[in-house]
Amino acid sequence: MVVPFPGSPRPTLGVEWEIALVDRVTRDLSNTAAEVFDAVANLAGPEDPRITKELLRNTVELVTGIHSTVGEAMDDLDESLDLLRRAANPLGVDLICAGTHPFAQWSTQLVTRTPDYDELIERTQWWGRQMLIWGVHVHVGVSSPQKVFPILNALLQRYPHLLALSASSPMWAGVNTGYASNRALMFQQLPTAGLPYQFANWGQYEDFISDQMKTGVITKIGGMHWDIRPAPRWGTIEVRVFDGISTRAELSSLVALVHCLIVDLDRRFEAGENLPNLQPWHVKENKWRAARYGLDAEIILDEDSNERLVTDDLNDLLEKLAPTAVRLGCADELAAVAEIPRRGASYQRQRQVAEATGGDLVAVVDALVKELGT
C-alpha cells in the first residue's frame, strides 16, 4: 500500500509533554482529568487543542503547534502549563512529570473511555493496564520519505544518549527497580511498541504497514508506537525515547538535542554521506544498558563494537552539534544538555531524595512537584 508522506520543507518542531496529576495531600495519582478539562474549558474555552486526553485519567498531555525553534515551542508549552496549573490548583491537584510515579498502583487507575483506548486495553489486557508511564515526544519535519529511514536508523546510534539523559523512572509501585528507566522496558511489552525495524527505504515500510493492516495488527497507519517512528500525517520523524522530563530547563535542552541531531543527519544525507546504521542487536543492547545504568552506561558506538561511557561520548556529540545549534537558534539550550550529568539526571535525584528521607516516597513526589515549577 502507499503511505503518503507530505514532507516538511523546513525542519519544523513539535513537542508532546505528558503530565501526571497528583493529589496535593496524599501525593498519590489523582484520576481527575475530566474535572481538570472542565476547568480548562471554563478558563480558556472548550476543546483547547494544546491540552489533550491520554490513556489514563490521571494524565494530561500538552501539545504544541508547529514551530521553527526550540524557544517558540517552549513558549507554547509554558502557556499550556500555566493554564493547566490554574485549572488544577482549585481542585487540590498538583503536577509532575516523570517516567513513572514512585508508589502509585496501576490497579487503582481509571482508563479514559475512547474507542482507541478501549481497543488497546481489550487487546493487550494485563500489560495494557500496566502502562502507568509518562514520556515526551518530539517531532522534527523532514522534506521527503526517502530521507526518513536513513535518518531514523542513524538516530538509533544516539538512542542511549537520549534515554540516559531523560531517565526518570527508577521506582515502580513503591519498589526501587534498580533501573534508571523502568518505563522504557515496560512500554516495549506492548505488541506495537519498542524499537523500530531498521528498514532500508520507504518502500519496505509501506510493505510492512500493508502486512500489519491486512493481518489486523493495526487498523490505521499511526498504530505503530515505536520509540522512534515516522509520523506520515505530519511529515515528521517522531522521537519517543524520552522518559517524562521533570524540569522545563531539561525539557528545552533535550528538545534542542533532538532538533539538532535530525537536522544534522538531514544535512549529511543531502551531502551524499552514508549515514551510520548500527546492527540491530547493538541497538537493542544499548537500549537495555541505558535503561539499566542511565548515565553510567557503557554503550556500543559502532559496527566494530567499540564501547565508551555514554557521558564521554555525549561531550563529543555536543561539540559536533554546536554549529547546527547556532543555525537553529538553540545554542544555549543545546549547551545546557551538559548540565544534566553534572546536576544528576532525574532518576538519580529521585533516589537521592528517597535515601535522604529514609525511603519516604511521598517526599520524592514533593520534589518532583517542586521541580516542575522550575
UniProtKB/Swiss-Prot annotation:
Question: Keyword Manganese on this protein?
Answer: no
What's the short name of a Pfam family annotated to this entry? GCS2
Which reaction does this enzyme catalyse, per its entry? L-cysteine + L-glutamate + ATP = gamma-L-glutamyl-L-cysteine + ADP + phosphate + H(+)
What UniProt keywords are attached to this protein's entry? ATP-binding, Ligase, Nucleotide-binding
Q: Which InterPro entries match?
A: GCL_type2/YbdK_subfam, GCS2, Gln_synth/guanido_kin_cat_dom, YbdK
What NCBIfam families does the record point to? gshA_cyan_rel, PRK13517.1-2, PRK13517.1-3, PRK13517.1-4
Q: Which family does it belong to?
A: Belongs to the glutamate--cysteine ligase type 2 family. YbdK subfamily.
Q: What is this protein called?
A: Putative glutamate--cysteine ligase 2-2
- Annotated source species: Rhodococcus jostii (strain RHA1)
